Amino acid sequence: MKITKIEKKKRLYLIELDNDESLYVTEDTIVRFMLSKDKVLDNDQLEDMKHFAQLSYGKNLALYFLSFQQRSNKQVADYLRKHEIEEHIIADIITQLQEEQWIDDTKLADTYIRQNQLNGDKGPQVLKQKLLQKGIASHDIDPILSQTDFSQLAQKVSQKLFDKYQEKLPPKALKDKITQALLTKGFSYDLAKHSLNHLNFDQDNQEIEDLLDKELDKQYRKLSRKYDGYTLKQKLYQALYRKGYNIDDINCKLRNYL
């Protein structure tokens, strides 16, 4: 087969053959196979050229994708599939990128976990889930997590939550709020509980009473639209109890409030 036309199209070259076949190739392909108009290719040469062209094109796509941030093997492979690169070509590209250290799932997991230690607020369980979603295997994640101390991060997150809710909740509710938030963020129950030891939950009676008054007013405005009488009183009691207020304090307030 003879090449009848070579035309540059942005980043690729259009090649037309005398059998009416056409294909797009990279500049690397042009150079490697010394392609030019009127060059004759046999079937083996043509197949080699097609394979290299897709390999070169796919690798360029992958490098572009990697130029924005670190990616996992799976993320790169999925990206190439979206661009219709053949599976056996994808496997070759991934191997090359690994050998050239463009992609490394273990390093990606390590970087992700270290960045979270500096700027994030996630515990090990959530971190593992996020890394698994990126296609990184457990055996690349678990050793790094096991060597990482999350106690200081848990304390930092708990302090931030404490500062946010201290003037809104009584001690018991505040402890429950912080503990639940830490569990949701992926910290263990033991680590969440331990982080509470560094916080001062002491509130004087007047502070607690003021919080109770505010919460009672808030719940009354909400519930009195639907309920009255004994039902309203029960609903108020339940709402305040769920917020962590003392039973005796609630009963005393409700007797004087209604």
From Swiss-Prot:
It holds the Pfam family RecX_HTH3. Its main location: cytoplasm. Modulates RecA activity. It comes from the Bacteria. GO terms for cellular component: cytoplasm. GO terms for biological process: regulation of DNA repair. InterPro entries: RecX_HTH_1st, RecX_HTH_2nd, RecX_HTH_3rd, Regulatory_RecX, WH-like_DNA-bd_sf. It comes from Streptococcus pyogenes serotype M49 (strain NZ131). This is Regulatory protein RecX. The gene is recX. The lineage of its organism: Bacteria, Bacillati, Bacillota, Bacilli, Lactobacillales. It is found in: Cytoplasm. Keywords: Cytoplasm. Belongs to the RecX family. The keyword Cytoplasm applies.
